[in-house]
Amino acid sequence: MSKIGKRAILLLLALPIGFNVMAQETKKPTLEELIPGGESYRYADNLYGLQWWGDECIKPGVDTLYSIQPKTGKETMVITREQINKVLEENKAGKLSHLYSVSFPWADKPQMLFKIAGKFIVYDFKSNQVVSTLKPKDGADNEDYCAASGNVAYTIGNNLYVNEKAVTNEPEGIVCGQTVHRNEFGINKGTFWSPKGNLLAFYRMDESMVTQYPLVDITARVGEVNNVRYPMAGMTSHQVKVGIYNPATGKSIYLNAGDPTDRYFTNISWSPDEKSLYLIEVNRDQNHAKLCQYNAETGEPMGVLYEEMHPKYVEPQNAIVFLPWDPTKFIYQSQRDGYNHLYLFDANAANMKGETYNSANGGTYFQAGKVKQLTKGNWLVSDVLGFNTKRKEIIFTAVEGLRSGHFAVNVSNGKISQPFENCKESEHSGMLNASGTYLIDRYSTKDQPRIINLVDTKNFKETANLLTAESPYEGYQMPSIETGTIKAADGTTDLHYRLMKPANFDPAKKYPVIVYVYGGPHAQCVTGGWQNGARGWDTYMAGKGYIMFTIDNRGSSNRGLAFENATFRRLGIEEGKDQVKGVEFLKSLSYVDSERIGVHGWSFGGHMTTALMLRYPEIFKVGVAGGPVIDWGYYEVMYGERYMDTPESNPEGYKEC
């Protein structure tokens, strides 16, 4: 055969492959592929259930459990599901369908904990035997297993139980052992075991005085009415007490905190010796927080260790944490210098004389004893991961804007492992081992959906890469993403934006724009993580030919207290002004069709969508508001009054917003 003939055959053989690649590269992801819950949703690879057993990393799978040495990354098989199920069947304890839900709460014991058919099972994976089983009563909810004592707290209906014993017997309208204050102030549970498991602190919420509102279920053939107690801004709120239950005696006491009317109790924690219970009390106006100590045996107050006041609001969200090597010292998180940072406190300060000082954030604070600020800078501590006792260090995660990373601060000399400025744009979370020497670092970047590394906390360098996930949309036609900053309506503050352009973008064309907005507290839409925080819906609409634009206005999170509380008593107003600045930026772009700009958002974003449509009808041609807050007077007491005060004290603000 001639060379020309061979070349022709090779070309023909290559054509289908080339056509197939071209077809794949021009394929746009569907809504089902982009939205979680879709039947064909494409997600990045992950390692589920990754955790520590003491200082060994545990990697579960469906059928096999592996341990990973953090220094080398070497994997060793620990046990198989088949081995466990054989023993479980012999004990008539059921079967595990996978190993992802297994946990290792005992750092010094070869034991794991899992749950089958409502039973908590402790299993020794060295001797291959069931150590213990514990089954709460039927209907159990809010389960809280204590690894130190082997007891489990839970609720049935509105009452609290420990093991099989009822701790409370309250009528309808009084709820025990569940979250209170509408899950504000960092509250996400209602029971708190002491370090050794000898005592259980719990919430008791009396909401019998709160107005009931009917929710009608129309999905049934005959409609049903379910009443919910919902305290709206300015109205009567529920009253909370904190109890302490002793499983050994079966008796409970309640803290003698005084009249609970218009007071919030949050951030509950124990002293290492279980003799004291600590909590942070916030007043109804939410402008005064007090760290209080109580006697765990009698419930009597032992003193106030710290107070923080601000003319706008204070919002404590983290319980104190004691140093594992010194039970007389604890870590307190505060925004008193304008950013959330770590402070070292003396636990004996309740008996000391204190003074009041002016804080850098515009408020004041009262403290007794010696207090040392451990972290400082125009960035925030977002999570305390734990301690390295040998090096006397606190390991934590920090964030500011699009950058985040892990750090260590030495409690003795205040030295931090690296400057925050070394952080790159990314989104990190971490899990520390028992000794604080290594951590599991999960993070993403704009172009990388997920990376999981084991990291040495001595220098925060990777020792083993466990996963580098590829984009689940490799080969698809994807939009391009740009980020940058513009000035807020105050003319000085930088705001981060994300601009998503359709694939095959043509700068000579005019494109319609959808502004996706949230804009409220405790949320950041533009991040340094995967696709800069863009959602699948954004990608889908970009595929339909829209430019997608998002800006984090003042009032959103991870930029410091002044950035967040700039919207105080005027929710939606200042945020709206910043969103308009974003639109002005859009209109400066030659490829934006300024006559076709829409806005969309959910929840607080629904409120923003409605407000923008009504206040700036000349800008936005269409708006879609999902679950919007239309009138802040109908929102809950805790959230609404923090940012707006009461309708009685701020009538013009409520009317304007």
Write out the residue ranges for each language-model feature.
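Extended, charged, solvent-exposed helical/coil segments
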Residues: 385, 421, 429-432
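Serine-hydrolase catalytic core recognition
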Residues: 212, 274, 428-657
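Bacterial N-terminal signal peptides that target proteins for export
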Residues: 1-9
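Beta-propeller folds
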Residues: 21-417, 437-438, 446-448
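Bacterial N-terminal signal peptides
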Residues: 9-18
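Active-site donor-binding loop signature of nucleotide-sugar glycosyltransferases
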Residues: 36, 80-81, 135-136, 169, ...
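C-terminal outer-membrane/trafficking sorting elements
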Residues: 3, 19-22
